[in-house]
């Protein structure tokens, strides 16, 4: 028997999500149901599903997450569980603020990667700007991958989920657009849980507003218009490539632009969120 559930649709720099409000944890979404919801032809279409649930109702204790906090139960489009999604956190925080589910503009959200502090800089029911404390952008080493028989070397970066950020020497934004981005072949010993791969332009010297461009292939999804944790990984790798340990970088993705701050102890991601639709769906 099919079940009818309420949903909303939102995106952050065109990384789009289905939002399911389930504070008491009563909606049991299977991997197959998530896949069907995210199907862009036979379903609603999205890069993933954000289930809005109280951490204490999740049934699984996450270290550092208070049971009373709102928890972002995030699923990739293929139905797999994901530890973290930076763009998803922005949309999640926007949803909470727009529906008066929090009483302050600064609050903490639980994720499978741990607690994430957010600041809602502005919000109405349609649009918001949110800053997320993403935690340390931890470098895990150097690795390589193959994309369409072309080798790319990059920096492994852990943001609660794994990334391989490949800064490509001499790559221009125009040339980046023309790369035939497809599923990467990567070192499974280095990335046993799979990996998100970013192709990144170099950070130019002498800019008042340092910027990079990137494209991303997301684990469990494919190429997306944006990836929040991926922009942080890309900024970390681009700064390191330019001989810098810290800095603020504007990251341009196909879906727009975000601001990433890399600090000694943590990183931040600031960017827009938009809620575009609400409704009900039978699955």
UniProtKB/Swiss-Prot annotation:
Entry GO terms, CC: cytosol
The protein's Enzyme Commission number: 5.1.1.7
UniProt cross-references to Pfam families, sorted A to Z: DAP_epimerase
Alphabetic keyword roster: Amino-acid biosynthesis, Cytoplasm, Isomerase, Lysine biosynthesis
Catalysis performed (reactions): (2S,6S)-2,6-diaminopimelate = meso-2,6-diaminopimelate
Sequence positions that bind substrate: 15, 76, 86-87, 161, 196, 218-219, 228-229
One of the GO BP terms on file: lysine biosynthetic process via diaminopimelate
Enzyme class: isomerase
Principal place of residence: cytoplasm
Record function comment: Catalyzes the stereoinversion of LL-2,6-diaminopimelate (L,L-DAP) to meso-diaminopimelate (meso-DAP), a precursor of L-lysine and an essential component of the bacterial peptidoglycan.
InterPro entries for the chain: DAP_epimerase_AS, DAP_epimerase_DapF
Protein name: Diaminopimelate epimerase
Subcellular location: Cytoplasm
Site (Could be important to modulate the pK values of the two catalytic cysteine residues) residue list: 163, 218
Family: Belongs to the diaminopimelate epimerase family.
Cysteine pairings via disulfide bonds: none
Pathway assignment: Amino-acid biosynthesis; L-lysine biosynthesis via DAP pathway; DL-2,6-diaminopimelate from LL-2,6-diaminopimelate: step 1/1
Binding partners and assembly: Homodimer.
One GO MF term attached to the UniProt entry: diaminopimelate epimerase activity
Active-site residues annotated for this sequence: 85 (proton donor), 227 (proton acceptor)
Gene responsible for this protein: dapF
Organism: Corynebacterium efficiens (strain DSM 44549 / YS-314 / AJ 12310 / JCM 11189 / NBRC 100395)
HAMAP family: DAP_epimerase
PANTHER family linked to this entry: DIAMINOPIMELATE EPIMERASE (PTHR31689:SF0), DIAMINOPIMELATE EPIMERASE, CHLOROPLASTIC (PTHR31689)
